């Protein structure tokens, strides 16, 4: 079962991070990929929602610990009429955080610093409708939750 309707063609992206250096680095990385187009960078949750709405972004990559971020921001974004795919990004692998992000409607939770060249591949999986959890120990936790 796919979580979202897969995106076809160009993937428009809003990057939301309260550290502009991180946002710029992510934009630079995705800008090297022919199928990604960063349409906006935001530093607050409100700005991320406004940018996603204005540009009808297919994907929002957001720091889940920035002011106005987290599960509430994910709910606001997936509640937009065009329902963008939301990928959460965090410097910490805290299971409580990533499970709340996914429960709020996020399609991914990715760990900063472990992505490098994998980020475009993982984000493509998200926009194809797959759930992506790039956090150490996530598979074991999910197995425990699903076991009888």
What are these regions (language model features)?
Residues 1-12, 146:
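Non-catalytic signal-transmission and effector/linker regions of two-component phosphorelay proteins
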Residues 58, 62-64, 90:
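Active-site residues of response regulator receiver
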Residues 98-103, 113-148:
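Short, flexible helix-to-coil linker/hinge segments that flank and couple to helix-turn-helix
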Residues 83-93:
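A short, hydrophobic beta-strand element within the central beta-sheet of small alpha/beta folds
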Residues 71-83:
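Short amphipathic alpha-helix used as the core "switch/output" element in two-component signaling
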Residues 41-59:
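Acidic, metal-coordinating helix/loop segments flanking the phosphotransfer/catalytic sites
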Residues 9-22, 26-30, 60:
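Conserved acidic segment of CheY-like receiver
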